[in-house]
């Protein structure tokens, strides 16, 4: 049976993984340094945390479910204990992209990240509809990259990732560089920033006298139908008035060179700021 050493097992992400690995075909050894995390594992899931040395002894796969800022240090601390052929799984592209993993050609590095439950979905169960992050009840897609290692290891890593992010719909294979374009580039630098602007726009119309709930209802409803048209979820076209508003509004809101956020140096700078 494949043995997994799960680092950060009692943390925010690690606890999700610890939960999802219950009943899986893997033997999981849980590593958690904080007392609160160890207690959470014990009382919530009935798991006892073990030392890093005990977890790594004979482990086939090591999952680093720790913050981006800690991955480099944790990886460096355990490198000497990793046997050739061990697979190291990281849950975000930032640290691998920034070069924070040890220079060990004899290890397999697999990077995976969730797409999170899509806005347009077929969920009917209320618990699934309220699972906005995913990995509990709501179905989601995922992306993965084999950064280094034998080609056969991709399927091995993908099988683990499908448990991590379960329930999974589509599984997309990308490179680490492409994953960095997706996050922080697409999802955070672009999408999150524009969503913050939308919230500020709601605040502005409220300050100008519109009822807050009315403003929220109006915006969120329009986001649904406008998004469905823009991304091809439904057949339809915008009104002439809407197209004219976009024509004149976009130059006011967006710099002409805004797409430079996807240039390699901009992606690298963004990742340096978070790692």
Outline where the language-model segments fall.
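Rossmann-fold NAD(P) dinucleotide-binding segment
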Residues: 56-100
